[in-house]
Amino acid sequence: MSSYLFTSESVSEGHPDKIADQISDAVLDEILKQDPKARVACETYVKTGMALVGGEITTSAWVDIENLTRKVICDIGYEHSEMGFDGHSCAVLNAIGKQSADINQGVDRENPLDQGAGDQGIMFGYATNETDVLMPAAITYAHRLMEKQSEVRKSGKLAWLRPDAKSQVTLKYEDNKIVGVDAVVLSTQHSEEVSQKDLHEGVMEEIIKPVLPSEWLSKETKFFINPTGRFVIGGPMGDCGLTGRKIIVDTYGGAARHGGGAFSGKEPSKVDRSAAYAARYVAKNIVAAGLADRCEIQLSYAIGVAEPTSIMVETFGTGKVANELLVSLVREFFDLRPYGLIKMLDLIQPIYRETAAYGHFGREQFPWEKVDRAEDLRIAAGLK
């Protein structure tokens, strides 16, 4: 019997890097509302008292970058100086330029289906049947802990909670099946006056226990709640934040490979984002079809070229049919050219700010989470 531990982490919407991601995606959404043909690569940097928004954007839209940035920061919960960061009073700097004409000529085409990839690169998508959302369990529950922290904070149930927080979940497996939670780490920013006793009790009763399955918890489960003790200084006052620095949190928590490209602030001509979404869509439909228990897809592209330069399917010994057959089915049922996958997943819409906290995958409101091709795949593969 094989036994092992696997761990994934998540961070809250108030983590500095996630503030940056949400600002970048809020800018993207506002532009897409006005100009569906915009080219956007928006990067944000936050530190004590300031937010710098930059990047390359070519658009006919007009967006009030300063007011939008302030709104995002305040929506997260940084709206007075005792937090160490205040969306009402922080400096907002704008350093946005235009996308290179050299890139434009490789992407834009007279026939939209010939649209080339915005860059070269590799992208991965993954799915597993160990949760109902076909995501790895460790990252799923790490995200849910952070969502619960935000819910409890914003409802006022634990008034001393502050926006910055991190979670980490270690699961124990035997013969590739989850048998329990080995360890939970939850660190949350808090106000000055709360005692460590009240903090530990509140986090355990209001955040951890309502989220983690009780049958996975035991006397052996280890809980690390604010293990350093005090966590008053947090958010951008404690650490600077930058768009695109939480790429494993954004995806599969380390349970699958990552091509290296970040998502936030990029419109769908950037295959770093759109093809990673398409790869998740493909992998999820393969698992939903019962063709594999686990599935990882790799795609690759060349700048200015429409067709993917490669498609790989890996099922880790869980496939019900050969991987070669799965590759041919992927080519038959999914249009993975940049324009094709944009249309297939309806990606030109202002949905991206919501992706920028608590993970891009495993959340049913997003179009790449549909399993509408599962039955077609199953029939084509010859499974009853």
From Swiss-Prot:
L-methionine binds at residues 56, 99, 239, 270. Its main location: cytoplasm. It catalyses: L-methionine + ATP + H2O = S-adenosyl-L-methionine + phosphate + diphosphate. Mg(2+) binds at residue 17. Keywords: ATP-binding, Cytoplasm, Magnesium, Metal-binding, Nucleotide-binding, One-carbon metabolism, Potassium, Transferase. Binds 2 divalent ions per subunit. One of its GO terms (biological process) is S-adenosylmethionine biosynthetic process. Its EC number is 2.5.1.6. ATP binds at residues 15, 164-166, 230-231, 239, 245-246, 262, 266. Gene3D superfamilies: 3.30.300.10. It is found in: Cytoplasm. This is S-adenosylmethionine synthase. The lineage of its organism: Bacteria, Pseudomonadati, Pseudomonadota, Gammaproteobacteria, Pasteurellales. The gene is metK.
